[in-house]
């Protein structure tokens, strides 16, 4: 009885964790899209400013960007975290050295969307961690649950093993909650016996 309460509580907790993670994921994906859009756009504007000779190519080193005018891969959330930080820090260093700020988008606007994404990213990692821990806890209880189910099953069948015919015995066991499923080859055998 005590195990059943713990198992049900673990099942409920896992479901809650999974639901929380799923709900937060929708909002998080919107934050990912906005951060990716602003970081990518800022890098494109920076590259165009370099092409127009408004910013020296050597200044791209402040951002950790290669001299080639390409946008780094921003598909993964980890790369967004990395490049967002590099772009924000690089722009602040360039401005502190006397450079003119890039507009449309401004680094302040990029930073706002990056910070929102970063908060959401950390929160989502927390939800994922809680879901994984709760699933591990539930999985660790499965063997004990299976043992209890098998023990109950065997006790119920042992109690009614002397009852004949077989269908009456199975009906008594069903009254105790046992559920029988016919295997595909058993169904064919039973149907062929009925047709004879």
Regions found by a protein language model. Give the residues of each.
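Basic/polar low-complexity intrinsically disordered segments
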Residues: 1-196
